[in-house]
Curated annotation (Swiss-Prot):
Record-listed (2R)-2-phosphoglycerate binding positions: Q162, K334, R363, S364, K385
Superkingdom classification of source: Bacteria
HAMAP family in the cross-refs: Enolase
Keyword DNA damage tagged: no
Family label: Belongs to the enolase family.
Matching Pfam families: Enolase_C, Enolase_N
Name of this chain's protein: Enolase
Organism: Corynebacterium urealyticum (strain ATCC 43042 / DSM 7109)
Cellular component terms (Gene Ontology): cell surface; extracellular region; phosphopyruvate hydratase complex
PANTHER family in UniProt: ENOLASE
EC id: 4.2.1.11
GO biological process, one term: glycolytic process
Keywords annotated in UniProt: Cytoplasm, Glycolysis, Lyase, Magnesium, Metal-binding, Secreted
Amino acid sequence: MAGILNVSALEIMDSRGNPTVEVEVILDDGSMGRAAVPSGASTGVHEAHELRDGGDRYLGKGVAKAVDFVNTEIDDALAGLEADDQRLIDQTLLELDGTENKSRLGANALLGVSMAVAHAAADSAGLELFRYVGGPNGHVLPVPMMNILNGGAHADSGVDVQEFMIAPIGAETFAEALQVGAEVYHSLKDVIKAKGLSTGLGDEGGFAPSVESTKAALDLIVEAIEKAGYTLGEDVALALDVASSEFYEDGVYNFEGGKHSSAEMVEVYADLVEQYPIVSIEDPLDEDDWEGYVTLTEKLGDKIQIVGDDLFVTNPSRLQEGIDRGAANALLVKVNQIGTLSETFDAVELAHRNGYRTMMSHRSGETEDTTIADLAVALNCGQIKTGAPARSERVAKYNQLLRIERYLEGAAVYAGRSAFPRFKN
């Protein structure tokens, strides 16, 4: 395999108008790989450190320091290393940084390099990225968990739940699932407009109407599904990302105008699951409310997928704690939460080995980079969360999955309902 000739970075823009890091890696055989790093709005306190410049430039959000680290220290450290040894590359990056949370060089610098090296190695091998990473086992196309109604930190809609998603579980192929999702999305616009509500969009392409409650938002989506000609719970199921750490303070959940205990929130979710065909709830409790997660998992874990995002932050050690405690039963996978591909692979492998489902995910601040689409297939995640079927930084991932499905031809399998074995409608 070819060795690394040059590693360079560029400060580019993400979908929220903030700077982010793009890295280009050139190998000595002329192969090249490029990757751009995403950034979150609602970030967990246990995530790897995203290095920002501070000061006045870009309101403190510049990434010139991270770019400079890539162009100097990291370029020097990786020179001549074999690009196909991802473990060695990532271990070199971790040792060079030297901190537990990647705060010296920044997880945004490390991740950009880690992903770009993988792209370059795939190019050198003459393989698609998903095939290079996943080998022949990478053939399952994920269910698109489409965030078609935005709330929380992703919008100014007034509703506390951050994401209301649809899951096209009844489709036969990914292409069909995308069609179903797009039709429901457009139907939702008509439903919202007919009620005199705003059809403005949130960070991830979903609509952000001002609604009074979680149930009111779900009712809009239910109406849209039926208006589009699909059967609720059979063709299309529902999912939530509550992002509850955003409204948790001093041991209390400030939810929908009331102050709730962890036990009371568990009952809120039990009521929702009873009334709606919900297959998945992400971050239903605070990122450090381990006892609450155990209680919730005991109550609803045999019925739905309970996803740890801020709880696990794609970190194998935190995931292991969750496994040991019996907290949640699924892992959200965000590459920039942990900072290298090798650590991401370890987290996914640990999850699958212990019966936890996995959902590959974007961030609210995205770029046209499509790496996570390939990773979702390579790692057999079975689910991907990358926004509404709108805004090019979201659609880019869906389009890449369409290409992968075409590439695989008869070998492609759409996860569909099998991605949610606990759901029985």
